[in-house]
Amino acid sequence: MRLSYSRAWVGCCAVALAVIAGAAVLSSATKKTAFTPRDKAYYADQNTINFVRPGLKITIVSAKIAADGTLSVDYKLTDQDGLGLDRLGVTTPGAISPSFLVAYIPTGQTQFVSYVTRQRTSTDGKITVTQATGDTGGVQTQVADGEYLYTYATKLPKTYDPAATHRVGMYGSRNLTEFDLGTNYASAVFDWVPAGGKPTPREVIKTVSCDKCHDQLSFHGGSRRGLELCIMCHQPQTSEASAGQTVDMKVMAHKIHMGSQLPSVVAGGKYAIGSTDWSTVVLPSDPRRCAECHESTTGAAQANAWYTNPSRAACGACHDNVNFATGLNHVNLPQVDDNGCASCHIPKGELELDASIQGAHILPQESATAPGIVINLVKVDNGAAGKLPTITFTLKDKAGKPIDPATLVTSPNKISFVLVGPTTDYGNTTFAGVTTPGYVSEAAAALSKCGQDGTCTYTMTHAIPAGAKGSFAIGVEARRALVVLPGTVKQVSTQYGVDNKVIYFSVDGSPVVKRRAVVDTAKCNQCHVRLSLHGENRNQTEYCVFCHNPSNTSGTVSGINFAVMVHSIHFGDNLATAGTTYKIGTADFSDVRYPAFSNTGRPGDTTNCQMCHLPGTEAVFPIGMNPVKAPNLLMDPAPATTAACAACHTTRSNMAHMAAQTDPKFGESCDVCHDVNGQFSVIKEHAGK
């Protein structure tokens, strides 16, 4: 890659190179450990790395309050290796403009209050609100290379409480686009008690919990990162001006994540902050799964606050049809304050689905009363071309007790086996007597034969095609009905499924080859918690691809090959930019807002392939893969790599490029440029930091 440096940088090279030579020469090994394939700097040549020293880290060393209320903070600006950076961008490229916050938690309270606020008025002049904000006009002093002292312009009041927990926060950016290295962002917080002692900051959720779905929690242009910084302003003190509603984190976050399921939205209203409408948000998991955000394993100091400290603000954010003043939708019990909440809403009661916090948020299909269903596939006999394969499997409940398959005959109970192959590429094998593209599914409950130990056999009624070659696979799905709290006013009828299992076998005596693994169900469940579809039947990506293969479509509307479908659904509302949509039957996924945040702080960023992909699988397909039926794409059928990429890259110019690189005789030439080691490898082109 050839870089063109500005005249300003050519003029100061002598100074810069002297500094760099003495302090910042990095080895190739250091480069690889300092950056990831998600970073633009990972792909820069070593000379550029040595010269620019990309990256930005902010470290707050200390904070002090003088007798007259003057606040100062000692901080460091460093690159990825911890070497100091020039704030002004003279001796190291990229000027840095840090911003500063300060807040405290009043004694006896639990949320931050900012010392610095501003007033904002709505455009019609009818609403004026208070907002926490950052300090401006302070004085910067350099202490050492990369170390600075900032003295706030805002003085703390004489009545400030030195025994209270205080927090200073910083955020900033470093623009390195001149070197094709993007913009680096960073933030930091520092807690202390001015009078001495251990601070007790608010810590209900840690950023690591947010990042499971959001990848990198960042807002307001990208530099404000991490929940620890967010809650300094997003607390009860702050409201947005357009409608005067609070942007307190516990209210705002609950409402955004509840989104389309808010009672007020279901009733026809909307939830918006300024001009951004969050009413279409569909949480990737069930919003009753409070513990997926409120994780007890992260070390958050108040991780259990969600069930030990209920409040009208937090609970009413999701349950926004409750009127606490009148008691409407609250069993006619008005609540003038939060003092009585925990009297009824205890952490956990004796029964599921009761008024306790944890009980009320249980998903019926995950009830502890469910006996469970566990299936293991043991072996396949008679699995040769032209034969009827017999599957040996175990069928038990979670306590290890055998399940009679006769109890699974009547819907919604079931057990079914699906046969598919070859594993090199599903979707093009024709099974006699069925119209399903590339696979055959059989209900097995009535014909399964089981012993007293729960070991069963089932013989498929459809044969493996006579000319079949290579490896085939058989997968299982099963489901049981469940009634929770039968005979009570809380009775709920539901169903739950087994974890799909897959077994591979050779139909021609050749070595068994499993189907390629591209994504990992565990990665899906980082966001979806339990990816379970089609009536609690299908929950493992290894099994999903049986049916979601290159030959399968949703009528004449869309291709449902797994790569096309998942890319299209996750790309969601980005499709509108290209003037396209993605539908499966009547379900329109064009308003899906992917939860990952871009480097500039906006949701809908789909560039981090490894949020779903296994390492190294975000790559072009080998030559010779089956074409993909995809009515939603401009090319139908589409070559394998084209189909996967065009699900996101949907424009006509994108498609023209892909078509031009596909020869009718020799196929796609994507690997020439986009292979793992290509100049424009897939992962390199998706690097966004």
Where are these regions (language model features)?
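Long, contiguous interaction/targeting segments characteristic
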Residues: W9-C12, V25-S27, H220, W278, ...
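Bacterial N-terminal signal peptides
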Residues: C12-G22
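A eukaryote-biased signal for short, well-structured alpha-helical docking elements
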Residues: S27-F51, Q335-T369
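Extended surface/linker regions that mediate inter-domain or inter-protein docking
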Residues: A66-Y307, A384-T642, T650-S653
